[in-house]
């Protein structure tokens, strides 16, 4: 059987991803608009009590400053309508602008709105607002999962808001500036992963941690693919590099163990489990992650799937 991106997606099929994440997001999208906004607010308040959320970078916030200034000048009724329009994907200028922002810029925008709601600058959720039974069930589902899954759910709820970009004829993606690559010091270099000695995997981890994305993309086959959690594969060097710049800056990968095994036609399957820390939550949240690599006979990365695992015990599951 010939190797393809589609067939590569199924390596290490016993890997148990956190299916509760897309399931909860799907339930969230079925809620009425008012409940969606209230649920985000209640979840934001609860997470703020448990986790230290990093203040968004000032450079990133300059992309939203004009929009935030408009919102600050609005009446409470206008602010409420705008947030409803963002949640429902209404076609209006601010919703179109929002749709062009990268995930991190959208997160920074909602972080600032949350701060302003606490300060009374932006209309708060009405005092005594009661979530519907369905919304309460979704909120409880968010409470029941681990912090890494919680922030993934909340991230995706706001990332999917705004006007549908597929209906925009021409637009430019607005992303934060590419941060300069870091030196890979001896102190921070990953020199070994128990069970895996392949140098390409070590280079992948070290280059990602150092924001050395130009070097990182050279590890991939030209027709290679990368599958982020709960998404379809991204195929081709240019598209993968864009993903690195927009979604992977300042991540900290902490691989713990792995397994390597031959596959047909000279390919090699490698599975690594470990944790990833994000710049938003740092050491407070370590996401439980599996990386499922398929290397081609030239020892290039033909495919890698990144899975948010169902539970910490899955870190020990290296079976196939």
Label for each model-derived stretch:
Residues 186-190, 225-235:
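A short gly/proline-enriched turn/hairpin at secondary-structure junctions
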Residues 210-223, 227:
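Short, well-ordered alpha-helical segments enriched in acidic and aromatic residues
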């Amino acid at each position: 059987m010939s190797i393809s991106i589609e067939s590569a997606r199924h390596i290490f099929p016993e890997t148990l991803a956190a299916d509760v994440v897309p399931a909860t997001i799907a339930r969230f999208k079925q809620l009425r608009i008012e409940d969606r906004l209230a649920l985000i607010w209640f979840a934001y308040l609860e997470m703020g009590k448990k986790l230290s959320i990093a203040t968004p970078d000032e450079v990133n916030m300059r992309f939203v400053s004009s929009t935030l200034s408009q919102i600050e000048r609005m009446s409470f009724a206008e602010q409420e309508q705008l947030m409803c329009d963002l949640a429902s994907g209404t076609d209006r200028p601010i919703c179109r602008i929002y749709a062009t922002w990268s995930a991190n810029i959208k997160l920074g925008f909602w972080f600032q709105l949350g701060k302003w709601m606490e300060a009374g600058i932006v209309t708060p959720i009405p005092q005594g607002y009661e979530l519907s039974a369905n919304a309460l069930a979704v909120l409880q589902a968010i409470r029941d999962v681990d912090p890494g899954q919680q922030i993934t759910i909340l991230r995706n709820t706001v990332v999917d808001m705004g006007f549908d970009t597929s209906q925009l004829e021409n637009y430019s993606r607005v992303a934060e500036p590419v941060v300069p690559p870091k030196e890979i010091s001896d102190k921070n270099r990953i020199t070994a992963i128990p069970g895996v000695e392949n140098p390409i995997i070590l280079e992948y981890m070290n280059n990602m941690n150092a924001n050395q994305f130009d070097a990182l993309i050279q590890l991939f086959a030209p027709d290679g693919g990368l599958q982020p959690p709960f998404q379809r594969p991204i195929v081709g060097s240019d598209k993968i590099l864009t993903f690195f710049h927009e979604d992977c800056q300042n991540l900290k990968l902490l691989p713990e163990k792995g397994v390597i095994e031959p596959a047909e036609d000279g390919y090699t399957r490698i599975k690594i489990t470990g944790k990833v820390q994000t710049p938003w939550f740092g050491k407070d949240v370590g996401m439980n992650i599996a990386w499922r690599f398929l290397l081609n006979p030239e020892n290039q990365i033909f495919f890698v799937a990144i899975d948010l695992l169902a539970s910490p015990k899955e870190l020990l599951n290296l079976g196939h």
